[in-house]
Amino acid sequence: MAIQTDGIVLRNKTIKSIKSIYFLLEIDCPSIANETKPGQFVMLRTSDDNHPLLRRPFSVCKSYSTLHPRKGKRGHLLILYKKVGKGTQKMSTFKEGQEVNLIGPLGNGFILPPLPSSTPTILIGGGMGMASLSALGETLGSGELYVFIGGKTKDDILCGDDFPKGKVFIATEDGSRGKKGTVVGLFLSEIERFDRGRPHHVYICGPEGMVKSLSKVLKSKKWIVQVSLEARMGCGFGACWGCVVKTKNTEMVYQRVCKDGPVFPLSEIVWE
């Protein structure tokens, strides 16, 4: 159940380089960290002066509960964000010890493969989509894991070191790291190694164009594919209906990314 509460900033640092636009925000917030599942998100107030007025949604990159602490962290949330507008500009000035207000955990997260599982797992992410996949990676068992990461340049490759148990494939559009091209093209070049009649669990998060392309590639596969959708959100809990997506099951319906998602079966998304 989502709650509104204050957390304390533990660190707020750039990653990649000192001039990077990517930041990692660590917050001491046990009441939310204890309940967060991979794929869920929080709505964070980025300023005290209501400029901007609306909260901003952020996937939880890591959550360390008080019952299951890891790496010396207990009750902490990690949020990966990119400085792109007024809200994230103000976030980049958060100082250690500062109070921040959050609502969470929100949305429906990923459905995990049953454990133990011999079914291979594939993660495919682009850009900031790697945040929710990083959270997922820490919860998977010891089965086969393949991770495909894409970005425009080497500076846009995020969370590449977060999957020590998996085989990581990287693509950049300018060829500055890994294979030159898109992550979809990279996945297509490797798909034969997976296409052996076995079922697979596939998890996707990234830009809409990437997800659309993967939908075409995977629609003929009898794989279990889940996608975490990115969307602009007004409220974060379904009241404003500002983040709807058309889906199909037995009939066409509009569902709210914030409330009914952000994770959906890929086969249910209707692309227009």
Model-derived segments and their meaning:
Residues T36-G39, P57, L77, L133, ...:
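A general structural signal for well-ordered alpha-helical segments in protein cores
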Residues E251, F264-E272:
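A charged, well-structured terminal subsegment
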Residues T66-H68, K73, K86-R232:
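FNR/FR-type flavoprotein reductase catalytic core
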Residues S132, E208-G209, E230-P262:
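Local cysteine-cluster metal-coordination motifs and their immediate loop/turn environment
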